[in-house]
Amino acid sequence: MSDPFMPLFSVRSGAGFKAADGVYGLTVQIANVYFIENPSAPREIILVDAGMPQSSEMITNEMKRRFKEGYELKAVILTHGHFDHVGAIEVLLELWNVPVYIHEKELPYVTGKADYPPARPDAKKGLVAKLSPLFPRHTIRIPSVQALPSDGTVPFLEEWKWVHTPGHTPGHISLFRDKDRVLLAGDAVITVEQESLADVVIQKQELHGPPAYFTADTQTAAASVQKLAELEPEALLTGHGIPMTGKNYREDLLTLAEKLHSVL
């Protein structure tokens, strides 16, 4: 059974946006999902993450609005299995019988075998952090889920590769397209201080590490930020917050990684 609706909002909730060439985003309350067109078959759409609980209608309506008639959802790629990234997956799979891909180390959390660790409300100040023990962390069961290919390729998306970015969760991944240096980071890095309710509501744009209250291994998370810096991304499309584009973010990410190593 799906989790109940959670009354968490931002001013951008329901807003769709073009994030990069062939990549479109949708803010679902406080989290982003992304639609990627298959360059070899432009009517084929890959969904990255599945939003908040009870958000399936918002996601399907955006697909209809954005892609009009004739599109086909081919697969769902999950950056990880937290509730705000898998919230609509159950209903979406009732509408589309498609494969779901996730890192092999994340499989226990989406196959009924393991719950995520308890939230850490005191990891960082902020009202969202204080509320985090109320957020769902229980395992779910996705019948069609399977591990991503071990060679880093992304099904249906030959221009993209997946990068293991653990720390926030053991099997967290990010996606990278080398030709234009687009990084779809998931929660490995985000562009809003997710612990702060005020910043979440207004979507104050600022580079941050993953939400501290749900980050299991903080030092590994910092190392993952450093790994992403070495990709020299020029567009940061994140699981929370407004995308950042227009420059090489290597130095910004290295600075963030150093900060995280020192304070987490």
Predicted regions and their residues:
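Conserved beta-strand hairpin/beta-sheet module of binuclear metal-dependent hydrolase folds
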Residues: 12-66, 174-186, 190-191
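Residue-level marker for buried hydrophobic side chains located in beta-strands
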Residues: 46-48, 77, 100, 182-184, ...
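Active-site HxH/HxHxD metal-binding segment of metal-dependent hydrolases
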Residues: 54-56, 64-146, 259
